[in-house]
């Protein structure tokens, strides 16, 4: 039976929703603290066609915002296909360096501008040299934490949240109509790109899965968790070992990889003849020549930690006389103290029976990965709602969290990569306009008439 996120649903949901909630809360806090307003004259990839003016008619705003959203999605799709081609032709190092440059640019320029705005708004007494040193160290550490090995996962998670906050804070400066059309267009694009045949994101995931490689992308990875019910089974089905061959990253650090059971058994059989300290198995040798052993002993004796070369040669010569089943039975008995100590004794047979399930993805061991774009556009929606009223902020937050929970449930059912934007964004947009057009007038009316406090 395949493992599911439902086995540890609460921990998985909290591990994803907590950083999303923190990101949205800090974006709302920045919006209120810095009094962020839409800048109609801002020029970016999101408004290449039409620059919104307050004096424009509704029809002009509608047509211009729709054109901006279409162009923005087309640009994102084109860049994504370029990334697919680069990854297909093994330009992985180039992609990693590009991601590091992107992180440096976001933290250094966009984050630096927000940092200066905070200093000016709150009149923080700091000189320019100290400010530059702090910003430089903060940027360099964030850049190194993207793909460098040996970085604590908590630090990497924090920088992913920070980059989401910085980009979302800049997106909130876009005009209102353009922002809403871009959010809806991105939700639809995410749905097509991940699920449609030939979609760029689907091609990336399938290509990475076929190569058994990690995607060179900015994703938030929740800490992997294993439920108590699956812990014993996962020990047998997906043994974890520290491998120094193919699992060395660019920085030279050794990564933790999942080793299949048949690989472990094969390594164990190959190394059993090369170990300096061999376990000596002395069998009853009544049917063996008298020259091999003079003292016949009944039963089986084991000396697990004997390093004598002669004893090793004797053990090897005796072991080669048996068939493969005898070798496996001897190894089972020799390893029984270690197996019982590590709690794998009951799962040895089960592990052998699960060798054919190498392609099963164990989500409970890997954890859930959420793209940085999901953090950004969740926060953009809430930040845009914060420019109107706190009531719309509450409604949009509940809608986004509910949509994310539905996505996690679907993830556990289908056990494949799913888009995280469509459900949450659609619910958030619907809740925003329902709250703004229906709920807020009703609440304000009954409150002013002292019918509700």
Swiss-Prot record:
Chief subcellular location: endoplasmic reticulum
Record field: compositional bias (Low complexity): 227-240
Position of sequence motif PAL: 419-421
Intramembrane runs of residues: 418-438
GO cellular component: endoplasmic reticulum membrane; Golgi membrane; Golgi-associated vesicle; intracellular membrane-bounded organelle
Modification Phosphoserine occurs at: 296
Mode of membrane association: Multi-pass membrane protein
BP GO annotations: Notch signaling pathway; protein processing
Coiled coil: none
Location in or out of the cell: Endoplasmic reticulum membrane; Golgi apparatus membrane
Functional description taken from the UniProt entry: Probable subunit of the gamma-secretase complex, an endoprotease complex that catalyzes the intramembrane cleavage of integral membrane proteins such as Notch receptors.
Family (UniProt): Belongs to the peptidase A22A family.
Quaternary structure (record): Homodimer. Probable component of the gamma-secretase complex, a complex composed of a presenilin homodimer, nicastrin, APH1 and PEN2.
Protein name according to UniProt: Presenilin-like protein At1g08700
Lineage: Eukaryota, Viridiplantae, Streptophyta, Embryophyta, Tracheophyta
């Amino acid at each position: 039976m395949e493992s599911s996120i439902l086995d540890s649903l609460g921990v998985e949901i909290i591990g994803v929703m907590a950083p999303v909630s923190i990101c949205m809360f800090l974006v709302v806090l920045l919006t209120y603290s810095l009094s962020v307003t839409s800048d109609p004259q801002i020029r970016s990839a999101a408004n290449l066609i039409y620059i919104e003016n307050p004096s424009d008619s509704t029809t002009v705003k509608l047509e211009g915002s729709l054109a901006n959203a279409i162009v923005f999605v087309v640009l994102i799709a084109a860049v994504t296909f370029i990334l697919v081609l680069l990854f297909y032709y093994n330009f992985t190092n180039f992609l990693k360096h590009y991601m590091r440059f992107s992180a440096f640019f976001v933290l250094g320029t966009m984050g630096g501008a927000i940092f200066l705005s905070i200093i000016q708004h709150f009149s923080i007494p700091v000189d320019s040299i100290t400010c530059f040193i702090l910003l430089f160290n903060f940027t360099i550490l964030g850049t190194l934490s993207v793909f460098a090995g040996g970085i604590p996962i908590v630090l990497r998670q924090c920088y992913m949240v920070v980059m989401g906050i910085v980009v979302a804070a800049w997106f909130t400066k876009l005009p209102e109509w353009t922002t809403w059309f871009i959010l809806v267009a991105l939700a639809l694009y995410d749905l097509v790109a991940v699920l449609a045949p030939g979609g760029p994101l689907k091609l990336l995931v399938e290509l990475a899965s076929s190569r058994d490689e990690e995607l060179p992308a900015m994703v938030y990875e929740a800490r992997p968790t294993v439920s108590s019910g699956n812990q014993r089974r996962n020990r047998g089905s997906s043994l974890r070992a520290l491998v120094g061959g193919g699992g060395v990253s660019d920085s030279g650090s050794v990564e933790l990889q999942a080793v299949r059971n048949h690989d472990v058994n094969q390594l164990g059989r190959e190394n059993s003849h090369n170990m300096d300290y061999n376990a000596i198995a002395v069998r009853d040798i009544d049917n063996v020549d008298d020259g091999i052993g003079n003292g016949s002993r009944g039963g089986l004796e084991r000396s697990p930690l004997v390093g004598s070369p002669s004893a090793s040669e004797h053990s090897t010569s005796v072991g080669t006389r048996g068939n493969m089943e005898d070798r496996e039975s001897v190894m089972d008995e020799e390893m029984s103290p270690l197996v019982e100590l590590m709690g794998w004794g009951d799962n040895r047979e089960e592990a052998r029976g699960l060798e054919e399930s190498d392609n099963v993805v164990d989500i409970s061991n890997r954890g859930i990965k959420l793209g940085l774009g999901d953090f950004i556009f969740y926060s953009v929606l809430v930040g845009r709602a914060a420019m109107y009223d706190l009531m719309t902020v509450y409604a949009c937050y509940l809608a986004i969290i509910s949509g994310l929970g539905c996505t996690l449930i679907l993830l556990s059912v289908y056990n494949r990569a799913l888009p995280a934007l469509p459900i949450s964004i659609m619910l958030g947009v619907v809740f925003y306009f329902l709250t703004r057009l229906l709920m807020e007038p009703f609440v304000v009316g009954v409150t002013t008439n002292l019918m509700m406090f």
